[in-house]
Curated annotation (Swiss-Prot):
GO molecular function: ATP binding; magnesium ion binding; thiamine-phosphate kinase activity
Name of one Pfam family that matches: AIRS
Protein name: Thiamine-monophosphate kinase
Organism: Methanocaldococcus jannaschii (strain ATCC 43067 / DSM 2661 / JAL-1 / JCM 10045 / NBRC 100440) (Methanococcus jannaschii)
Protein EC: 2.7.4.16
Binding site for ATP: Y104, G121, D122, R145, S220
Cross-referenced HAMAP family: TMP_kinase
Amino acid sequence: MDEMKVIEIIKKTLKFSNENIVKGIDDDCAIIKIDENFYLVATTDMMVKKAHIPSILSPYEIGGRILTANVSDIASMGAKPLAFLVSISLSKEEANEKFIKELYSGLDDFSKLYDCPVVGGDTNRGDELILSGTAFGITDNPIYRRGKVGDDICVTNDLGRVYCALTLYYMLKENKISYKEFERLCQKYPKIIEKLRKPIARIKEGLLMNKLINGCCDISDGLGKEITYFKNFEIYSDRIFKLIPEDVIEFCDAFNLNPIKVALNSGEEFELLFTTSKFNKVKDSLKGYSKIYKIGKIIEDGQFIDGEEFYGGGYIHKW
């Protein structure tokens, strides 16, 4: 069983709603109508140590990461962050003052970056570190995962660095390289390891694009998975190649990786994948903040890459 099947079971089981719920399961955030002009958006994301937290991350970086992962969903809705709740389960290893202070220092610094204060949560004891965050935002125009036929499909900035960083991490973890070699490679590819350690949610971009785009989601599970939420599309590998940074190309050459597959499968990038019929206006609105790249089009029917059936990608939890 995979997470998509689990979600389908949950959706079929949960039947009750009310007139305040505009959108529940099936988008980056739930959308709740406050009044005629504003919507509350809410999202939750969880990090489990063994599944999500590389051992090379510091407690400070873990704190920043859980906040970024949640706030990135707020960004994809074109909303302004309001507040953040975080619940933690600590094992004996983490239940000490040093770890807790560092973790919450990361949360505090990133909350200032996103203007999203941490306002509460819960604490518990467990066998391993687990963090569960809930972020709230507000908007007058929530952006869904969708597109209109003919829309350009676009991505902010670049993709691939997180995949490369995790490749290095697993090489170290599986004893394929020494720690000394790992440190050398981190120094050789500083931007690659930095994207893993300190990812940034595109809050400003989401707000600036709000009235100019038709659909959006954040790239948390990889472009290859997120693109399928837009249902019918054609994307092009030569365009995807243009948003792959030089250090990722160099890394792929050094370690015999396909850069297109790396870009499609690189998760937790937290860039924005969006659809628009106003590419030039979006580009102008983001000057000084982010570059954007066209990678394809919304079409009438089907999912294709370079004219062939799309083979998918990205990360899906499996049991």
